[in-house]
Amino acid sequence: MAESGQPSALTTAFAPPPPLWKHFTPENVKRLEEIKKEASKGEDGKPRKKTWTPAELRALDLPPELRFLVPPEVPTEGHYSVFGELQSLSTALPSLKDQGIEQLYPSSPAAESGRDTSEPSKPLNHAYYLLKISKSLLLNFLEFVGVLSICPEQFESKVNDLRNLFINAHHLLNLYRPHQARESLIMMMEEQLSQSREEIQQMDKLKAEITDALDRLRRQGVDVDSAAGAAVQEEKPTTAEAQISDHSRLVWDLLDGDN
Protein backbone atom coordinates (compact mmCIF):
# COMPACT_ATOMS: atom_id res chain seq x y z
CA MET A 1 0.00 0.00 0.00
CA ALA A 2 2.84 2.39 0.81
CA GLU A 3 4.53 1.69 -2.52
CA SER A 4 1.34 2.19 -4.50
CA GLY A 5 0.62 5.50 -2.78
CA GLN A 6 4.11 6.94 -3.33
CA PRO A 7 3.71 7.89 -7.05
CA SER A 8 0.41 9.67 -6.44
CA ALA A 9 1.98 11.59 -3.56
CA LEU A 10 4.85 12.73 -5.78
CA THR A 11 2.60 13.96 -8.57
CA THR A 12 0.37 16.16 -6.42
CA ALA A 13 0.49 19.94 -6.83
CA PHE A 14 2.08 20.36 -3.40
CA ALA A 15 4.10 17.19 -2.99
CA PRO A 16 5.39 16.33 0.49
CA PRO A 17 9.15 16.62 1.05
CA PRO A 18 11.27 13.49 0.60
CA PRO A 19 11.75 11.34 3.72
CA LEU A 20 15.37 12.47 4.12
CA TRP A 21 14.17 15.78 5.62
CA LYS A 22 13.89 13.99 8.96
CA HIS A 23 17.70 13.87 9.13
CA PHE A 24 18.01 17.68 8.96
CA THR A 25 17.87 18.16 12.72
CA PRO A 26 19.82 20.84 14.64
CA GLU A 27 21.90 18.09 16.24
CA ASN A 28 22.89 16.57 12.89
CA VAL A 29 23.67 19.96 11.37
CA LYS A 30 25.88 20.79 14.36
CA ARG A 31 27.66 17.43 14.12
CA LEU A 32 28.33 17.98 10.41
CA GLU A 33 29.78 21.43 11.09
CA GLU A 34 32.06 19.97 13.77
CA ILE A 35 33.30 17.28 11.38
CA LYS A 36 33.95 19.89 8.68
CA LYS A 37 35.80 22.09 11.15
CA GLU A 38 37.92 19.15 12.31
CA ALA A 39 38.74 18.14 8.73
CA SER A 40 39.75 21.68 7.75
CA LYS A 41 42.43 22.02 10.44
CA GLY A 42 45.89 22.87 9.18
CA GLU A 43 49.32 21.87 10.42
CA ASP A 44 49.04 24.38 13.24
CA GLY A 45 45.88 22.68 14.46
CA LYS A 46 43.65 25.67 13.73
CA PRO A 47 40.55 25.31 11.53
CA ARG A 48 40.65 27.17 8.23
CA LYS A 49 37.84 28.74 6.29
CA LYS A 50 36.99 26.44 3.42
CA THR A 51 34.18 26.14 0.91
CA TRP A 52 33.28 22.48 0.73
CA THR A 53 32.13 20.91 -2.51
CA PRO A 54 29.68 17.97 -2.49
CA ALA A 55 32.46 15.65 -3.66
CA GLU A 56 34.73 16.70 -0.78
CA LEU A 57 31.93 16.23 1.73
CA ARG A 58 31.19 12.75 0.43
CA ALA A 59 34.88 11.90 0.79
CA LEU A 60 34.66 12.54 4.53
CA ASP A 61 34.03 9.67 6.91
CA LEU A 62 30.43 10.59 7.71
CA PRO A 63 27.95 8.40 9.56
CA PRO A 64 24.92 7.25 7.52
CA GLU A 65 22.51 9.74 9.10
CA LEU A 66 24.76 12.67 8.12
CA ARG A 67 25.22 11.63 4.50
CA PHE A 68 21.71 12.86 3.74
CA LEU A 69 22.91 16.39 4.59
CA VAL A 70 25.45 16.35 1.75
CA PRO A 71 23.98 17.98 -1.39
CA PRO A 72 24.07 15.83 -4.53
CA GLU A 73 26.12 16.69 -7.58
CA VAL A 74 24.43 18.91 -10.14
CA PRO A 75 23.40 16.68 -13.06
CA THR A 76 25.09 17.54 -16.36
CA GLU A 77 23.42 15.04 -18.67
CA GLY A 78 20.51 12.64 -18.84
CA HIS A 79 17.34 13.25 -16.82
CA TYR A 80 16.30 14.35 -13.35
CA SER A 81 13.10 13.75 -11.42
CA VAL A 82 10.70 16.49 -10.29
CA PHE A 83 7.56 15.43 -8.42
CA GLY A 84 7.93 11.93 -9.84
CA GLU A 85 8.23 13.10 -13.48
CA LEU A 86 11.43 12.79 -15.50
CA GLN A 87 12.75 16.05 -16.95
CA SER A 88 15.41 16.12 -19.65
CA LEU A 89 18.50 18.31 -19.34
CA SER A 90 18.61 18.78 -23.09
CA THR A 91 17.48 22.20 -24.31
CA ALA A 92 16.44 20.84 -27.71
CA LEU A 93 12.68 20.79 -28.23
CA PRO A 94 11.60 17.15 -28.74
CA SER A 95 9.22 16.46 -31.57
CA LEU A 96 5.66 15.35 -30.94
CA LYS A 97 6.47 12.03 -32.58
CA ASP A 98 9.25 11.42 -30.07
CA GLN A 99 6.74 12.05 -27.28
CA GLY A 100 4.20 9.64 -28.75
CA ILE A 101 1.71 12.38 -29.66
CA GLU A 102 -0.08 12.70 -32.97
CA GLN A 103 1.19 15.68 -34.96
CA LEU A 104 -1.60 17.60 -36.70
CA TYR A 105 0.60 19.77 -38.92
CA PRO A 106 3.35 18.87 -41.42
CA SER A 107 6.93 18.68 -40.23
CA SER A 108 9.45 21.33 -41.15
CA PRO A 109 11.15 20.55 -44.50
CA ALA A 110 14.54 20.73 -42.79
CA ALA A 111 13.52 17.93 -40.41
CA GLU A 112 12.34 15.55 -43.13
CA SER A 113 14.68 12.67 -43.88
CA GLY A 114 15.43 11.60 -47.44
CA ARG A 115 14.66 15.04 -48.88
CA ASP A 116 16.75 16.35 -51.75
CA THR A 117 18.88 19.04 -50.12
CA SER A 118 19.87 20.55 -53.48
CA GLU A 119 16.37 22.04 -53.88
CA PRO A 120 15.41 24.99 -51.66
CA SER A 121 12.61 24.20 -49.24
CA LYS A 122 9.71 26.43 -48.33
CA PRO A 123 9.56 27.38 -44.64
CA LEU A 124 6.68 26.06 -42.60
CA ASN A 125 3.92 28.64 -42.14
CA HIS A 126 3.38 28.31 -38.40
CA ALA A 127 0.79 31.09 -38.24
CA TYR A 128 -1.43 29.32 -40.79
CA TYR A 129 -1.48 26.06 -38.83
CA LEU A 130 -1.94 27.86 -35.53
CA LEU A 131 -5.05 29.49 -36.97
CA LYS A 132 -6.34 26.13 -38.21
CA ILE A 133 -5.76 24.52 -34.81
CA SER A 134 -7.52 27.43 -33.07
CA LYS A 135 -10.58 26.98 -35.28
CA SER A 136 -10.49 23.23 -34.66
CA LEU A 137 -10.40 23.90 -30.93
CA LEU A 138 -13.58 25.96 -31.13
CA LEU A 139 -15.33 23.33 -33.24
CA ASN A 140 -14.26 20.46 -30.97
CA PHE A 141 -15.34 22.39 -27.89
CA LEU A 142 -18.82 22.85 -29.38
CA GLU A 143 -18.92 19.13 -30.19
CA PHE A 144 -17.75 18.38 -26.65
CA VAL A 145 -20.61 20.45 -25.20
CA GLY A 146 -23.03 18.61 -27.49
CA VAL A 147 -21.73 15.22 -26.35
CA LEU A 148 -22.12 16.23 -22.70
CA SER A 149 -25.72 17.28 -23.32
CA ILE A 150 -26.69 14.10 -25.20
CA CYS A 151 -24.44 11.28 -24.01
CA PRO A 152 -22.16 12.42 -21.17
CA GLU A 153 -20.50 9.03 -20.73
CA GLN A 154 -18.85 9.37 -24.17
CA PHE A 155 -16.91 12.49 -23.27
CA GLU A 156 -13.47 10.85 -23.16
CA SER A 157 -12.78 10.81 -26.91
CA LYS A 158 -13.55 14.52 -27.24
CA VAL A 159 -11.39 15.35 -24.24
CA ASN A 160 -8.51 13.50 -25.90
CA ASP A 161 -9.10 15.43 -29.13
CA LEU A 162 -9.03 18.74 -27.27
CA ARG A 163 -5.91 17.70 -25.39
CA ASN A 164 -4.14 16.77 -28.63
CA LEU A 165 -5.10 20.08 -30.23
CA PHE A 166 -3.80 22.07 -27.26
CA ILE A 167 -0.51 20.14 -27.23
CA ASN A 168 0.01 20.75 -30.96
CA ALA A 169 -0.73 24.46 -30.57
CA HIS A 170 1.64 24.70 -27.61
CA HIS A 171 4.36 22.89 -29.55
CA LEU A 172 3.99 25.26 -32.50
CA LEU A 173 4.32 28.23 -30.15
CA ASN A 174 7.46 26.73 -28.62
CA LEU A 175 9.01 26.58 -32.10
CA TYR A 176 8.95 30.38 -32.02
CA ARG A 177 11.09 30.55 -28.86
CA PRO A 178 14.47 30.93 -30.67
CA HIS A 179 12.96 33.64 -32.88
CA GLN A 180 11.55 35.38 -29.80
CA ALA A 181 14.95 35.26 -28.09
CA ARG A 182 16.66 36.80 -31.13
CA GLU A 183 14.06 39.55 -31.43
CA SER A 184 14.30 40.32 -27.70
CA LEU A 185 18.09 40.59 -27.97
CA ILE A 186 17.80 42.86 -31.02
CA MET A 187 15.30 45.09 -29.19
CA MET A 188 17.53 45.32 -26.11
CA MET A 189 20.60 46.22 -28.20
CA GLU A 190 18.62 48.84 -30.14
CA GLU A 191 17.48 50.42 -26.86
CA GLN A 192 21.07 50.55 -25.59
CA LEU A 193 22.24 52.05 -28.89
CA SER A 194 19.46 54.65 -28.80
CA GLN A 195 20.31 55.55 -25.20
CA SER A 196 24.01 55.93 -26.07
CA ARG A 197 23.18 58.17 -29.04
CA GLU A 198 20.92 60.30 -26.86
CA GLU A 199 23.68 60.74 -24.26
CA ILE A 200 26.15 61.71 -26.99
CA GLN A 201 23.68 64.27 -28.36
CA GLN A 202 23.21 65.75 -24.89
CA MET A 203 26.98 66.03 -24.41
CA ASP A 204 27.39 67.63 -27.85
CA LYS A 205 24.60 70.09 -27.03
CA LEU A 206 26.21 71.00 -23.70
CA LYS A 207 29.58 71.40 -25.40
CA ALA A 208 28.05 73.75 -27.98
CA GLU A 209 26.40 75.82 -25.22
CA ILE A 210 29.69 76.12 -23.32
CA THR A 211 31.57 77.06 -26.50
CA ASP A 212 28.98 79.74 -27.33
CA ALA A 213 29.18 81.12 -23.79
CA LEU A 214 32.97 81.32 -23.96
CA ASP A 215 32.81 83.03 -27.38
CA ARG A 216 30.38 85.64 -26.04
CA LEU A 217 32.70 86.33 -23.11
CA ARG A 218 35.63 86.74 -25.48
CA ARG A 219 33.64 89.18 -27.62
CA GLN A 220 32.88 91.17 -24.46
CA GLY A 221 36.61 91.51 -23.81
CA VAL A 222 36.93 88.89 -21.09
CA ASP A 223 40.22 86.98 -21.29
CA VAL A 224 38.75 83.56 -20.61
CA ASP A 225 42.01 81.67 -21.21
CA SER A 226 43.99 83.84 -18.78
CA ALA A 227 41.26 83.63 -16.16
CA ALA A 228 41.22 79.87 -16.44
CA GLY A 229 45.02 79.68 -16.16
CA ALA A 230 45.11 82.00 -13.14
CA ALA A 231 42.41 80.03 -11.40
CA VAL A 232 44.28 76.81 -11.97
CA GLN A 233 47.52 78.28 -10.59
CA GLU A 234 45.79 79.66 -7.50
CA GLU A 235 44.10 76.41 -6.67
CA LYS A 236 47.24 74.31 -7.35
CA PRO A 237 45.50 70.98 -7.77
CA THR A 238 47.54 68.01 -6.73
CA THR A 239 45.74 65.30 -8.66
CA ALA A 240 44.21 64.83 -12.10
CA GLU A 241 40.76 64.50 -10.53
CA ALA A 242 41.18 67.88 -8.83
CA GLN A 243 42.20 69.52 -12.12
CA ILE A 244 39.15 68.15 -13.89
CA SER A 245 36.87 69.22 -11.05
CA ASP A 246 38.31 72.77 -10.94
CA HIS A 247 38.04 73.16 -14.69
CA SER A 248 34.42 72.01 -14.64
CA ARG A 249 33.63 74.39 -11.77
CA LEU A 250 35.16 77.28 -13.70
CA VAL A 251 33.08 76.52 -16.77
CA TRP A 252 29.87 76.39 -14.74
CA ASP A 253 30.78 79.66 -12.99
CA LEU A 254 31.24 81.31 -16.36
CA LEU A 255 27.87 79.98 -17.53
CA ASP A 256 26.14 81.19 -14.36
CA GLY A 257 27.74 84.61 -14.66
CA ASP A 258 26.69 84.89 -18.29
CA ASN A 259 23.08 84.08 -17.42
UniProtKB/Swiss-Prot annotation:
Its main location: nucleus. GO terms for molecular function: transcription coregulator activity. Residues 1-11 have a biased composition (Polar residues). Residues 24-46 have a biased composition (Basic and acidic residues). Keywords: Activator, Nucleus, Transcription, Transcription regulation. SUPFAM superfamilies: Mediator hinge subcomplex-like. It holds the Pfam family Med7. It comes from the Eukaryota. GO terms for cellular component: core mediator complex; mediator complex. Residues 1-55 are annotated as: Disordered. InterPro entries: Med7/Med21-like, Mediatior_Med7, Mediatior_Med7_sf. The keyword Transcription regulation applies. It is found in: Nucleus. Gene3D superfamilies: 6.10.140.1520, 6.10.140.200. Component of the Mediator complex, a coactivator involved in the regulated transcription of nearly all RNA polymerase II-dependent genes. Mediator functions as a bridge to convey information from gene-specific regulatory proteins to the basal RNA polymerase II transcription machinery. Mediator is recruited to promoters by direct interactions with regulatory proteins and serves as a scaffold for the assembly of a functional preinitiation complex with RNA polymerase II and the general transcription factors. Component of the Mediator complex. Belongs to the Mediator complex subunit 7 family. This is Mediator of RNA polymerase II transcription subunit 7. It comes from Aspergillus terreus (strain NIH 2624 / FGSC A1156). The lineage of its organism: Eukaryota, Fungi, Dikarya, Ascomycota, Pezizomycotina.
